[in-house]
């Protein structure tokens, strides 16, 4: 059981984790912008793309066997949960942590402005019916109807979608996040319907040592909707 990696360029290793329902192909449009400065390492998470299902410990061991000793790590949406857990458990390997429209807890509760679990359940049901149509509509909504030609290479497995749904509903790193001392940044989109921008105010209070960036006109995919701003932020953060 091998994790599928796709590498581009030379330089500081930058590992990218995709979000739920997608695979590493979602990063393809920004590779030309990152490749001159970084060695980009795209990862298909378990049950997505070309990576088979596996549990967390198998994923971590398999991944670390294929990665450099130290690297910067960026996770988008659900991928941010994977990235955060990796940084909490293996801080000696992760030099920088970048969370893109992600948070330590996705589901809302009485004192946390996440999203209702029904949103993910509905998305899951739509994905199960017509994955390409659902993903294209999702991207169109997040990019405010901006044209983006996304071709999904390998549809996620039903097990991958279900496991991802469980992760989004149950993983909660709000307490463990206080242990993180590596440089960490959280990126939010003011128009994001999935990771509400008001999460940022709570996080700034609870985790004052982290950096926070708000994309005023972005929704859930600022790396595609505002690529130039996103690349500038990455270059300023990763020294």
Curated annotation (Swiss-Prot):
GO BP of this protein: biotin biosynthetic process
UniProt-annotated location(s): Cytoplasm
Keywords: Biotin biosynthesis, Cytoplasm, Hydrolase, Serine esterase
Xref: Gene3D superfamilies: alpha/beta hydrolase
GO cellular component, one term: cytoplasm
Keyword Cytoplasm: yes
Family named by the database record: Belongs to the AB hydrolase superfamily. Carboxylesterase BioH family.
Name by which UniProt lists this protein: Pimeloyl-[acyl-carrier protein] methyl ester esterase
Organism for this UniProt entry: Legionella pneumophila (strain Lens)
UniProt lineage: Bacteria, Pseudomonadati, Pseudomonadota, Gammaproteobacteria, Legionellales
């Amino acid at each position: 059981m091998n994790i599928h990696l796709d590498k581009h360029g030379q330089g500081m290793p930058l590992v990218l984790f995709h979000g739920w329902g997608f695979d590493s192909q979602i990063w393809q449009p920004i590779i030309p912008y990152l490749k001159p400065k970084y060695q980009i390492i795209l990862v298909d998470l378990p049950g997505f793309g070309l990576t088979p299902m596996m549990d967390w410990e198998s994923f971590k061991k398999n991944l670390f066997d294929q990665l450099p000793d130290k690297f910067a790590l960026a996770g988008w949406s659900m991928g941010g949960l994977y990235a955060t857990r990796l940084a909490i458990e293996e801080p000696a390997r992760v030099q920088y942590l970048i969370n893109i429209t992600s948070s330590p807890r996705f589901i809302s509760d009485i004192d946390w402005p996440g999203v209702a679990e029904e949103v993910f359940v509905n998305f899951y049901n739509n994905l199960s019916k017509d994955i390409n149509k659902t993903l294209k509509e999702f991207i169109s909504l997040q990019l405010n109807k901006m044209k983006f030609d996304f071709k999904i290479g390998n549809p996620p497995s039903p097990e991958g979608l279900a496991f991802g749904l469980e992760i989004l509903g149950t993983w909660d790193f709000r307490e463990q996040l206080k242990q993180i001392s590596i440089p960490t940044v959280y990126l939010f989109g003011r128009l994001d319907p999935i990771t509400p921008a008001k999460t940022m105010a709570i996080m700034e209070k609870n985790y004052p040592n982290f950096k926070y960036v708000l994309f005023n006109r972005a929704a859930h995919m600022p790396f595609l909707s505002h690529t130039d701003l996103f690349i500038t932020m990455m270059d300023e953060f990763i020294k």
